[in-house]
């Protein structure tokens, strides 16, 4: 029985990087007889231009029917002045919410070949392997009420709401505990419980759940301290679990510990491990169309897709190994290039990974 993957290239460099990931996916599909069927559609700004909406109803229906979704990136300055409800990012938020993709897994893994590319000293980041588990469908980005108005004294003001219910907290903490159990058995729950009521509930629930995971060491950390500790001593962390906005910020910070956000994949999963997979980086409109974008994060997102949503562990391992082989050979895109390495473009990097497979 075949499995269906919906491909959404998105905007900016999305089409370029996704093309290389699809190249890898098609190669392993044939070589490993995976019986995968690929289809394509638009999301974000591309969907706004095609359908008049950043997420068309028919695209959402196709995503529901698919076994997994592979996304490039969304957004661009040409859509910054349109109705906020129609901006590309709203399509991304909507598809996550409608598909119930509440758990975002963002690894921050430093390839030893790229230790010099990190902005931190090699001895601080050597061997770095962190997983950030971010709650994706609740909190400040979705909370109601939200909006803007004129206050009683005539000023413009805007407001947002940060709600979390116990069931939302429990299900993301469960993912955090389970992932920690599979890794180094250390879980750091990040909150702002000294200020926020939602974080106080979060910390209480985490403490209650820890009793069910006696093999996992749970620690708590305020988000401001966590941001500092990620730079001071990042290797103290194994798995970090946190709410939506904190995870958004910390995962981007952690990505730069690895040398380039262009190396980092991500997975967004529902309760049944059906998911959407995308690189951690954005649409990079400043380099779109130049053929210089790093496709490795998207290729590694394919590996995560095969591992978590398809159960093809050996194929996922093979892709990750192939990326390591390519880095060993000295090939680098511009974002990870250093003296003595060979600078290549997007297509050449994708071809090299296929050759290594």
UniProtKB/Swiss-Prot annotation:
Record-listed E.C. numbers: 1.1.1.85
GO biological process, one term: L-leucine biosynthetic process
Pfam families registered for this protein in UniProt: Iso_dh
Sequence positions that bind NAD(+): 76-89, 282-294
Residues that hold substrate according to the record: 96, 106, 134, 224
Pathway annotation from the record: Amino-acid biosynthesis; L-leucine biosynthesis; L-leucine from 3-methyl-2-oxobutanoate: step 3/4
Record's keyword terms, sorted: Amino-acid biosynthesis, Branched-chain amino acid biosynthesis, Cytoplasm, Leucine biosynthesis, Magnesium, Manganese, Metal-binding, NAD, Oxidoreductase
Location(s), subcellular: Cytoplasm
PROSITE patterns named among the record's database cross-references: IDH_IMDH (PS00470)
Record-annotated disulphide pairs: none
Site (Important for catalysis): 141, 192
Cofactor: Mg(2+); Mn(2+)
Keyword NAD part of the UniProt annotation: yes
MF term (GO), any: NAD binding
Domain of life per record: Bacteria
Catalytic activity: (2R,3S)-3-isopropylmalate + NAD(+) = 4-methyl-2-oxopentanoate + CO2 + NADH
Protein residues bound to Mg(2+): 224, 248, 252
Cofactor binding comment, as recorded: Binds 1 Mg(2+) or Mn(2+) ion per subunit.
GO CC entries: cytosol
PANTHER family reported for this sequence: 3-ISOPROPYLMALATE DEHYDROGENASE
Summary of the function given for this chain in its UniProt record: Catalyzes the oxidation of 3-carboxy-2-hydroxy-4-methylpentanoate (3-isopropylmalate) to 3-carboxy-4-methyl-2-oxopentanoate. The product decarboxylates to 4-methyl-2 oxopentanoate.
Assembly description: Homodimer.
Family as reported in the entry's similarity comment: Belongs to the isocitrate and isopropylmalate dehydrogenases family. LeuB type 1 subfamily.
NCBIfam families: leuB
Annotated protein name in UniProt: 3-isopropylmalate dehydrogenase
Organism expressing this protein natively: Xylella fastidiosa (strain 9a5c)
Organism taxonomic ancestry: Bacteria, Pseudomonadati, Pseudomonadota, Gammaproteobacteria, Lysobacterales
């Amino acid at each position: 029985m075949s499995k269906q993957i919906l491909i959404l290239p998105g905007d900016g460099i999305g089409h370029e990087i996704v093309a290389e990931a699809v190249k890898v996916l098609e190669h392993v599909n044939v070589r490993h007889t995976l019986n995968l069927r690929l289809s394509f559609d638009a999301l974000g700004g591309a969907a706004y231009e095609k359908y008049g909406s950043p997420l068309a109803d028919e695209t959402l229906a196709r995503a529901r029917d698919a076994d997994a979704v592979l996304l490039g990136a969304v957004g661009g300055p040409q859509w910054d002045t349109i109705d906020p409800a129609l901006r590309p990012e709203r399509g991304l938020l909507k598809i996550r919410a409608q598909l119930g993709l509440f758990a975002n897994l963002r690894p921050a893994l430093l390839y030893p070949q790229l230790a010099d590319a990190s902005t931190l000293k090699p001895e601080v980041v050597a061997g770095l392997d962190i997983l950030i588990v971010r709650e994706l469908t609740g909190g400040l980005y979705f909370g109601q009420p939200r909006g803007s108005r004129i206050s009683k004294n005539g000023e413009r003001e805007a407001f947002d709401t940060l709600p979390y219910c116990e069931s939302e907290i429990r299900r993301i903490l469960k993912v955090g505990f389970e992932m920690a159990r599979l890794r180094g058995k250390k879980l750091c729950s990040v909150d702002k419980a000294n200020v926020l009521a939602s974080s106080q509930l979060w910390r209480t629930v985490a403490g209650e759940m820890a009793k069910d995971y006696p093999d996992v060491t749970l620690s708590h950390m305020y988000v401001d301290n966590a941001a500092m500790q990620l730079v001071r001593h990042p290797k103290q962390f194994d798995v970090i679990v946190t709410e939506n906005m904190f995870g958004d910020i910390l995962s981007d910070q952690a990505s730069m510990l690895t040398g380039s956000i262009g190396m980092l994949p991500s997975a967004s999963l529902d309760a049944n491990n059906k998911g959407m997979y995308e690189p951690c980086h954005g649409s990079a409109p400043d380099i779109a169309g130049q053929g210089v974008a790093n496709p490795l994060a998207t290729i590694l997102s394919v590996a995560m897709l095969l591992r978590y949503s398809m159960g093809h562990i050996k194929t996922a391992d093979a892709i990750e190994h192939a990326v390591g082989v390519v880095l060993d050979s000295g090939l680098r895109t511009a974002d990870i290039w250093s003296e003595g390495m060979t600078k290549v473009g997007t297509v050449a990097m994708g071809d090299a990974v296929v050759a290594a497979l």
